[in-house]
Amino acid sequence: MSSKGKFYMTTAIAYTSGKPHIGNTYEIVLADAIARFRRQEGYDVYFQTGTDEHGQKIQEKAEKAGITPKEYVDNVAGEVKRIWDLMNTSYDNFVRTTDEDHEKQVKKIFKKLYDKGDIYKGSYEGLYCTPCESFWTESQLVDGKCPDCGREVQPAKEEAYFFKMSKYADKLINYINEHPEFIQPVSRKNEMMNNFLLPGLQDLCVSRTSFSWGIPVDFDPKHVVYVWLDALTNYITKIGYDADGNSSDLFNKNWPADLHLIGKDIIRFHTIYWPIFLMALDLPLPKQVFGHPWLLQGGEKMSKSKGNVIYADDMADLFGVDATRYFVLHEMPFENDGIITWDLVIERYNSDLANILGNLVNRTISMSNKYFDGVVKSTGVTEEVDADLKAVVTSARDKVAEKMKNLRVADAITEVFNLFRRCNKYIDETAPWVLAKDEAAKDRLAEVLYNLVESITIGACLLKSFLPETADRILAQLNAGMREYDDLDKFGLYENGNKVTDKPEILFARLDAKEIMPKIDAVREAQKAEFEAEQKALGGLPETTEETGEAIDIEAKPEIEYDDFMKMQFQVGEIISCEAVPKSKKLLCSQVKIGSQVKQIVSGIRKYYTPEEMVGKKVMVLVNLKPAKLAGVLSEGMLLCAEDAEGNLALMTPEKAMPSGAEIC
């Protein structure tokens, strides 16, 4: 197959503050599926990932651990790479921002921008969020806290260098308007335009003097380069960009990037800071930045203190690498956050991998051996049902390609499994076990099994980008090779008279939840114990972490009649999207799925939950409350909360997994 041209793609480089959990790992698996499919299509792919290793947060963690920052990041970077390799990701380059060649170019880039007049020296007095490595103004805070992570900010005053962001703001606005594909999904573009660009950009602080773990400004070494200027430039430095004009052939071939794949929480840095830095360097902008959603544990962010963190290596130990890849790829929608729970992982494993796929392959090979000693041969004895199967199979490639073109990877893998579902239906329609009882139907039986083997072969080739090891195992059992992309819309290329394996292996053995849940509980307890040991070592955790909470009494309200109570309708709802209400510091506006309907509900809980934390939660809803407007926004119900003596609120959620729409009685 001739090359369709270059395709340079990157992930965000993982911040080396700790071991990446499954939510972090999702990004590299998503990127790998895209890279593999682009290669399959015929693109010359260069896929880069790596680690972001500088900053105040890392320096503080290293000091607490009693080691140097370099020792600290060496350990974490090694762990990140181990997990990326465990997940069978096909990156071409793993970068580290402590690499000498990167540090050399960052210094040259900083000097070039300074000489150009885009960076100038001044002093900074403002508010700084250490975990996010971000400066904020008072007006940008949400309830006095960092708008990105909700943590406390600290006053900071120091001499600093600044970048003239406002100089390029209009140019960037015009670029975004003229290139609607640049920021995806569209909701991310709207957020950047309305919240940052249109209100006006302030100059950006691009150096620090209050810590030392960073790349020094070579002409003023008491300053270190702002972590985001350092980190973002890896996309060009690590493919050979040279600020002096001596860039490598690799850079000249691959820049601009075709895709930056990042988490939605860092979209601002990649769609405002990064393109403006590139404009200042007179470099073309990346073709697309995709801000993917988050993978949440049961609707909540993962936290070791809660024992709810899920790590990729734990999942791989329990379910296998490809099962882990399948889950994170299948469960992540295009725009909204995905939900992961151990129960859901087991359900998907059994229903999709063990039943739909594994059982199909095993049955087909077993019947081929039972009825024809494993020989697969087309006899030409066809029926109408064959044409429908072939239509589904030969159209699958283009359906998958269309989904992948638009980065709808979950939909793409669903299309592949739709092919396998159609094969299972074909078995039910043709009933090979019935045909086997009739000697006159022997040729028809052979044709049915040939059609199944051919269909599964094509399906396995399409599965290769998503579950590479499983695809190889299927093809090996069918005694078939990987096909060229251009042949995946053709039916009948399986070699006539070929022989499948006489010893089919089980791809995915069905799981018994009763047997595996104790293993999962052990993982949870180990996480909690590890967290408590870490915190006690740092002096940050009391002897017990159990929440006690004293009982409180509240003023009694008048009794009501039972009939009055029965007028109220309570149901379980699932929050599918949430955003802050403009011009309000207290209100959140949620779209809540209740059965088959979606209601918009405004709640005064912004102090206690971020919009991101809300998405995916199962909540208790008063659904028949008369609609009313709060701060000018229509609210069609009420979310039930509990309130303690200090007025703190907590959402009421079902104790056990309940479907959206379940009645509360």
Which residues are covered by each model-predicted region?
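Helix-rich, typically C-terminal accessory recognition domains appended to large enzymatic cores
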Residues: 121, 343-381, 392-500, 622
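Phosphate-backbone binding interfaces of nucleic-acid-interacting proteins
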Residues: 542-665
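Intrinsic disorder at enzyme termini
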Residues: 474-564
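Secondary-structure transition/capping motifs at alpha-helix termini
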Residues: 1-3, 36-44, 64-65, 69, ...
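A glycine-rich helix N-cap at a beta->alpha junction
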Residues: 78-92
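Structured secondary-structure scaffolds
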Residues: 2-49, 101-105, 149, 155-370, ...
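Cys/His-rich short segments
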Residues: 116-169, 173
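N-terminal catalytic cores of NTP/NDP-binding nucleotidyl/phosphoryl-transfer enzymes
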Residues: 2-76, 95-110, 115, 132, ...
